[in-house]
Design a protein with these regions (language model features):
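C-terminal regulatory/oligomerization modules of transcriptional regulators
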Residues: 1-2, 125-140
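N-terminal leader segment of winged-helix/HTH proteins
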Residues: 1-32, 136
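Short, locally clustered residues in the helix-turn-helix/winged-helix DNA-binding domain
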Residues: 17, 43-47, 108, 135
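N-terminal helix-turn-helix DNA-binding core of bacterial DNA-binding proteins
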Residues: 22-63
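Short glycine/proline-centered loop/turn elements that form peptide/ligand docking sites
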Residues: 31-35, 66-69, 73, 123
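Residues within helix-turn-helix
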Residues: 53-54, 65, 72, 92
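Charged, amphipathic alpha-helical coiled-coil/dimerization segments
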Residues: 72-132
């Protein structure tokens, strides 16, 4: 069996991501009628309001066509809105609605609980250190 220190980082991150995504989807998102891409879209919009479909697609690494389906699903539930007036160009900025922001608040607490379950073998300081390392790597 290969030692953990010699396994490729991408493989280890994929395993962690898969475990976390599964836990979040089953315990938090599915009961609320959300998909993981919808949650990520709402999260991005909460951090950077008025994003275009293309910006959202790049933000969660999906095609613009796939993001359009995600946004339409959120629009049908009144969780996001497209601006009625376009400031410039062709893209209609997308924003989180009040209902979407409220649902995201509820979702975030469940996501945090799912993270704690997935990382249950870590102590609190180890979890904080891991989050700091991942944040640093993600901005590099």
């Amino acid at each position: 069996m290969e030692r953990v220190e010699t396994q490729p980082l991408g493989y280890l991150l994929h395993r962690l991501t898969s475990a976390l995504r599964s836990e979040v989807t089953v315990t938090v998102l599915t009961p609320l009628g959300l998909s993981f891409p919808q949650y990520l879209c709402m999260r991005l919009l909460s951090q950077s309001p008025s994003m275009s479909n293309a910006q959202l697609a790049r933000g969660i690494n999906v095609s613009p066509q796939a993001m359009n389906r995600v946004v339409r699903g959120l629009q049908k539930r009144s969780l996001v809105v497209r601006a009625a007036v376009v400031p410039s160009g062709r893209s209609q900025p997308i924003e989180l609605s009040f209902e979407g922001a409220e649902l995201l608040k509820r979702t975030n607490s469940g996501v945090r609980a799912a993270e704690r379950r997935v990382l249950a073998e870590f102590g609190e300081q180890d979890r904080r250190d891991l989050l700091k390392l991942l944040a640093t790597l993600g901005h590099g």
